[in-house]
Design a protein with these regions (language model features):
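Short, charged low-complexity linear segments at domain edges
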Residues: 1-10, 123, 140-141
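Iron-sulfur cluster-binding electron-transfer modules in prokaryotic oxidoreductases
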Residues: 35-282
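Iron-sulfur cluster-binding cysteine motifs and their immediate structural context
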Residues: 1, 13, 20-45, 212
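Short, intrinsically disordered, charge-biased short linear motifs at domain edges
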Residues: 6-16, 151-153
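Residue-level signal for mature regions of secreted extracellular proteins and peptides
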Residues: 12-18, 22, 159, 261
Length: 282
């Protein structure tokens, strides 16, 4: 498709859409082909050259508009509880989307503030946290726990009020223009904070988002205005497990009488996208 510069077909769109971006192909490929960038390019090309069925276009546009906006997504999630009893009246794709909505939306949420200061002692580091879009609504306790843990270890946490989505959702939908708008906004906002007040890292606690942030430098490698800024943001980005292991060197008492048994999910985008394998298992 790309070599012949022909419009994408229904069959090609089906295969491209089926890719989950787990990136295991990048790990297993003996030649080291970067399929992540190939599939991203393919998605953009499909979006530009293939006319999808009407309902498909409607659904993708709904996802593109709603999910990156936490307030809109929260409203939709709350509304879904009222709509579910009447889901049989809607097309299949709407019914499927309604079934994915949680029955209960968590009441916890981050305070409306930009800086979360350390609890006690001297500040040892200052980081920005990507709180995300969908996660902020569905699982806000993840961000809350991340901030508590970092504050407890004397790390000041900054949450930029103008940053919601990392941009990967529209990026994976092939909506390049919308994705790049998010990318540019995030880069400019974080870079300004980095220059004015200093940032030692940009923390991601969602592996898919972190993979995209670390790719900003590549995405804007040919943009003379954003190239250096994007590269700096990618360099600063660390998954929370990386930061805890490499920067804080947590002193965990393994000889404590109280024993803990936990399960850890080593996400595919973490292993294959970010090449983070050992933290926090070692």
């Amino acid at each position: 498709m790309l070599e012949n510069k022909k419009p994408a077909t229904k069959e090609i769109a089906k295969h491209i859409d089926s890719c989950l971006s787990c990136y295991s192909c990048m790990t297993t490929c003996p030649s080291g082909v970067n399929y992540m960038h190939l599939i991203d390019h393919g998605r953009n090309y499909v979006e530009e050259t293939y006319k999808r069925p009407f309902l498909d276009r409607v659904f993708r546009n709904i996802l593109s508009f709603v999910l990156p906006r936490p307030k809109v997504f929260l409203l939709m999630a709350l509304s879904s509880k009222l709509i579910k009893p009447f889901s049989f009246l809607f097309p299949k794709f709407i019914r499927n989307a309604l079934n994915l909505m949680p029955d209960k939306i968590p009441g916890k949420k981050l305070k409306d503030q930009k800086v979360y200061e350390v609890n006690k002692g001297k500040k040892v580091s200052r980081v920005a946290l990507l709180t995300g879009c969908v996660q902020r609504v569905i699982s806000p306790e993840i961000n809350e726990a991340t901030i508590r843990l970092l504050n407890r270890h004397n790390v000041e946490v900054v949450v930029m009020p103008d940053i919601n989505c990392c941009g990967s959702l529209n990026h994976h939908l092939g909506k390049q223009k919308l994705a790049h708008e998010s990318f540019k906004n995030n880069i400019e906002s974080w870079h300004e904070e980095y220059l004015k007040n200093g940032l030692d890292a940009i923390i991601s606690n969602t592996s898919g988002c972190g993979t995209t942030l670390k790719d900003y430098g590549h995405i804007f490698k040919n943009d003379k205005d954003l190239k250096k800024k994007a590269q700096k943001i990618s360099e600063l980005t660390k998954d929370i497990t990386e930061y805890l292991d490499e920067n804080l060197k947590l002193n965990i008492n393994l000889n404590s009488e109280k024993k803990y048994r936990i399960a850890y999910h080593s996400a595919c985008s973490m292993q294959h996208g970010q090449k983070v394998h050992d933290q926090p298992k070692d």
